[in-house]
């Protein structure tokens, strides 16, 4: 018997990377998972890859910055499964560079995906979870919210906002059995800066990485806590990644 048998989850950005890793961890434990993203090909590939797991995997193409599409995502999930136990707000965007060179388009795109997306997801999830007497929301943040990556002001600011949103939602949710938490990854997969520099902005060689499976296992731990317990915040990073002293 899986740890998530009978549970239903939505994972945004679930077609690849961290989101796919979390979706895999959930379906392997019997969860019915709906993955959402804009890229339909990645969604189709992820569904094909995860078929045959103990749980079920379905996809709904969704732009997390589009309010109408987000409302539809939750409506379709409820029509198919009748409940929602877990939401993972994972969709994310990165942009950066010297602050004097950044455009409003760059700034707004990161904020829309990284902040507006989780807000819309949480809003729709709260409507459902309040009625059913509880649920769990996991927001994917970043250690950038505490130790910023060099030349990353839009991304760093957005992840500070995600942490603030998480705390506010956790406060609102506690009277309704809704646990809200943030999972902050360090370097995962290809999170490396495009110019070859490390988080400090210096050329220091390849940075250590954790796998999407590591993220999946951690999200699973958070998702399978007893209903009256919440891991408000978790940080997952390579043992030898610069973190303390990073800046």
Which stretches of residues belong to each language-model region?
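C-terminal helical subdomain
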Residues: 175-178, 182-183, 190, 198, ...
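Active-site helix of classical SDR
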Residues: 122, 158
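Substrate-binding pocket helix/loop in short-chain dehydrogenase/reductase
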Residues: 98-99, 106-108
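Residue(s) in the substrate-gating loop at a strand-loop-helix junction
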Residues: 142
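Conserved glycine-rich cofactor-binding loop
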Residues: 15-17
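Active-site loop immediately N-terminal to the catalytic Tyr-X3-Lys motif
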Residues: 100, 147-153, 207-208
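The beta1-alpha1 cofactor-binding region of Rossmann-like NAD(H)/NADP(H)-dependent oxidoreductases
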Residues: 40-41, 61-72, 104
């Amino acid at each position: 018997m899986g740890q998530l048998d009978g549970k239903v989850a939505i994972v945004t950005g679930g077609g690849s990377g961290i989101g796919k890793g979390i979706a895999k961890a959930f379906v392997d434990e019997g969860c019915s998972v709906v993955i959402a993203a804009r890229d339909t090909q990645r969604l189709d590939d992820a569904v094909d890859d995860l078929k045959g797991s103990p749980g079920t995997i379905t996809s709904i193409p969704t732009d997390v910055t589009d309010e109408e599409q987000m409302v539809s995502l939750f409506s379709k999930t409820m029509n198919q499964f009748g409940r929602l136990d877990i939401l993972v707000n994972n969709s994310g965007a990165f942009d950066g560079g010297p602050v004097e060179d950044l455009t409003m388009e760059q700034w707004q795109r990161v904020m829309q995906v990284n902040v507006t997306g989780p807000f819309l997801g949480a809003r729709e999830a709260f409507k459902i979870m309040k009625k059913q007497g509880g649920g769990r929301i996991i927001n994917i943040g970043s250690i950038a919210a505490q130790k910023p990556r060099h030349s990353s002001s839009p991304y760093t600011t957005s992840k500070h906002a995600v942490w603030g949103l998480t705390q506010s939602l956790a406060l609102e949710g506690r009277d309704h059995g809704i646990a809200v938490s943030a999972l902050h990854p360090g370097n995962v997969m290809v999170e490396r800066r495009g110019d070859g520099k490390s988080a400090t902005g210096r050329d220091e060689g390849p940075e250590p990485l954790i796998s999407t499976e590591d993220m999946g296992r951690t999200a699973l731990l958070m998702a399978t806590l007893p209903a009256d317990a919440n891991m408000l915040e978790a940080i997952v990073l390579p043992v030898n990644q610069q973190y303390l002293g990073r800046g």
